[in-house]
Amino acid sequence: MLPNLSEIEARLIGCLMEKSVTTPDQMPLTLNALTNAANQKSARDPVMALTQSEVQRAMRALAQRRLVQIDENFKTGVAKYRQRLCGATSFVDIQLDCAQFAIVTLLLLRGAQTPGELRARAGRLYTFADNNEVATAASALIDDDTPETSIVVRLPRAKGRKEAQFMHQLAGEVDRSVPVGAEAGHHEA
């Protein structure tokens, strides 16, 4: 069963996944480092301005659901965090290869994206040969028989776009009938 993450929880898990690949020597992350990662102005959509209290509260909730591990150093009083959503220490039945890990990370950090956008943004996480490799890796995370349990869904192609977008369902089931950006009054810049 997929977790139903809040927007903040999805961002924090995405940050922990990203930093485990891009800065593995800094893992696990301190509260300050995780807050800074969540509030980055680049490579995030939407940009957030979370306080350390909000991050700490969300991390406690994630730890209760065993989606993160909190390593507490009682001598220094510093807690450090690592994700357990996927990988060897996962408590959720999510096993991802490197390409899929990159895709899920980017979807958690930036929301719905096309294969071209995922490929362009994945450089530090994984190098995709082409957009077809992205689409193949993302499609492997889709379960057509039970779409409500798919980690990823393919959204209909939005008007004016060449490609359909992919979106994660770790924050709840996504309405696959409406392309992202097609909601009333929403216009992309």
Q: What do the predicted segments below correspond to?
A:
Residues 6-28, 94-112, 138-143:
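Positively charged, polyanion-binding regions of nucleic-acid-associated proteins
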Residues 15, 58, 137, 169:
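Residues in the recognition helix of alpha-helical DNA-binding motifs
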Residues 23-47, 112-128:
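Short acidic, hydrophobic short linear motifs in intrinsically disordered regions
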